[in-house]
Amino acid sequence: MTIWDQPKENSLAALLHGMQIADGIEFDLRISSDGDFVVYHNELVPGEGDKSERSIERMSTSELRSLGIATFDELLSQRVLTDVWQAGGKTANIEFKVPHPAARIDDVDAHLSAMMGLLEESLVPFDLPARSALVYSFSPRIGSVAKSVGFEFPVTRLSPYLRPWGSYRIKRLVGTPGFVLSTVTGLIKEHREEGMPAVAMALQYLQGWERFAHPGTPMAISGGGLERLNRARAGM
């Protein structure tokens, strides 16, 4: 019996596998110092050097590729992925990652705008079916920037807000107040008022004891809680 060797997260192998066996994939995009998209989650590459030198946005595409980081162009060159994406029935959830402060990118709006322009340039030629790509970010500016530039793809904001730097635990510790003080109903209302077609939220809003940690009527992914959720999000 062959043992499946799980591919590395955000690798070409993982994304190609996911697009073939599932109804879609999720991946993270950052921009290199050369202005190219790279598929990478963390804000820094591993190492002991200065954080500014390890920030993805301050590294060249060739440097990042030498570390095994795939570019978005490499992903789009894979017909096994793009053919099924164009055929319909598959969705790609694309997260725009906000740079680490060490990258010294102060104008987040301009950075998001550049990412949107580059994504359109990359994907529009594929003439993807409607609702086959959703872009989201933890940045609270994602919606307003998308409107200001007339972005062609639907966007939504990830909740609760997590800052773009720090360890996994620190990020979640800082995000805890926002989680506790928000409600599923409130998030749905906010996203709807901003014209967002979907609500992207942490699973803890709907599952486990954490769903009782914030005010409002608890919702869930099954039973009566799911019925309440479906009523609240009708049309989204």
Could you tell me what each predicted segment is?
Residues 1-236:
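Phosphate-group recognition and catalysis centered on beta-loop-alpha active-site segments
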